[in-house]
Regions:
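N-proximal low-complexity "stem/linker" segments adjacent to membrane-targeting elements
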Residues: 1-27
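Cell-envelope/extracellular polymer assembly enzymes that use nucleotide-activated donors
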Residues: 4-7, 35, 191
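A conserved acidic beta->alpha catalytic loop
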Residues: 40-50, 68-70
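Glycine-rich, basic loop-to-helix element that forms the pyrophosphate-binding segment
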Residues: 66-82
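Donor-binding/catalytic cores of nucleotide-activated saccharide
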Residues: 71, 92-207, 213-229
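Short aromatic/hydrophobic "clamp" motif used to bind/position activated sugar donors
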Residues: 87
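Catalytic core of nucleotide-sugar-dependent glycosyltransferases
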Residues: 208-217, 222-251, 266, 270-293
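Boundary detector for helix-to-coil junctions that initiate low-complexity/charged tails
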Residues: 310-371
């Protein structure tokens, strides 16, 4: 058995100073028996120099170079060099609590799990604020801990998010299940993560905040999803095919269908430009028909999605946008009216009216006197 407890794989492409912060956070982890595999995905900035300098300070760092092929290929490449008992796939722009790897590793070994998931929050690079991210790991949906997909079959794709960086994986589990990341520009960890949740013999959820996920970074691929608008569709279809191949689709069908509908609308709501219409038509003509929603009983599909599904099936893209616009305007007006009523009924408003009444009354009296 390797003496390395955790192999940390970090794909980097033009990571700049955010990557430097990430790398030194990993170097300063309290768990020392680690290897740090930095896969340079053809960077043209100072990323290579950052790795080289860090490697002079820390012999645990390995520098691996590849021509630009994307983060998924870089992670898979990193796995070829990994020797640790567990593997952590980290993003080059995030940063970490010093005890992240130690706490995740100790709990993974203690509970003998294939996957350990832990909590994170968001760091807004524009406002420099930390924001809650409770949706990324919903403890209230986990009935027992450790657990398997069978314990949460109706929520297995909902209790956490399909990204890899807040999870620690047993390396032998990855090898045995032949898990790899899809070569997609975005959504490239979805297939790996969600298929691993169904294949894992045991999963543990660690209720500690250990990672800080950087958002609103202009260098992030997630802010240019218009260039890869259909990646979510390719990833979800590959996941469904894999679930069918291993004979587990029907066990998790309710969770998959509800997640896929939700994920499709999330992609629609968060994409801009010409890609919006492309995603809309993809949902209308490909995704919804492929799910055969009419076959399911009432209550199978969450009530959160029923109306939107009906609208997409009923309208073309322009009609749908027009309908959504008026719904939002009506909601905004209602919110404004309700706010005005609350203000008028508030004690502050009433006191203010009394205070203002006296000088206004005097002002009117003086005007009459002048006449």
């Amino acid at each position: 058995m390797s003496d390395i407890k955790v192999s940390v794989i970090i794909p980097v492409y033009n990571g700049g100073q955010a990557f430097k912060k990430c790398l030194y956070d990993v170097m300063n982890q309290t768990l020392k028996d680690i290897e740090i595999i930095c896969v340079d995905d053809g960077s043209t900035d100072e990323s290579a120099q950052i790795i080289s300098q860090a490697a002079l300070e820390d012999s645990r760092i390995q520098y691996v170079y590849q021509n630009n092929q994307g983060a998924a290929v870089a992670r898979n490449k990193g796995m070829e060099y990994a020797t640790g008992e567990y593997v952590s796939f980290l993003d080059a722009d995030d940063f970490y609590e010093a005890e992240m790897l130690e706490k995740a590793y100790i709990n993974s070994v203690k509970h003998d799990v294939d996957i350990c998931i832990f909590r994170g929050n968001k760091y807004d690079a524009s406002s420099h604020q930390y924001l809650s991210m409770d949706y990324a790991l919903r403890f209230h949906e986990i009935p027992c801990n450790p657990f398997t997909y069978k314990d949460i079959s109706d929520n297995v794709f909902h209790f956490c998010v399909g990204w890899a960086w807040d999870k620690l994986y047993r390396r032998q589990f990855i090898i045995d299940e032949k898990l790899s990341f899809q070569n997609l520009r975005t959504s490239n960890d979805l297939f790996f993560v969600f298929s691993s949740l169904v294949k894992a013999k045991k999963i543990y959820a660690l209720n500690e905040l250990l990672i800080h996920h950087r958002v609103n970074d202009s260098l992030s691929l997630s802010v240019t999803r218009e260039k890869s608008w259909n990646c979510f569709y390719l990833a979800a279809n590959a996941l469904k095919q894999e679930l069918e191949r291993i004979g587990k689709y029907h066990e998790v069908e309710k969770s998959f269908v509800n997640w896929y509908v939700h994920f499709s609308f999330w992609n629609l709501d968060t994409i801009e430009g010409d890609a919006y219409k492309k995603v809309y038509e993809l949902i209308k003509y490909e995704i919804l028909p492929s799910l055969h929603l009419e076959q399911y009983p009432a209550g199978f599909l969450s009530t959160n999605y029923v109306k939107r599904v009906f609208d997409v099936q009923s309208y073309d893209c322009d009609e749908y946008v027009y309908e959504q616009f008026f719904k939002l305007r009506k909601k905004a007006k209602q919110k404004s009216d309700d706010g005005a009523k609350r203000i008028k009924n508030s004690k502050t408003y009433k006191v203010g009216k009394i205070v203002l009444f006296i000088p206004l009354h005097i002002k009117k009296w003086l005007k009459r006197r002048k006449k």
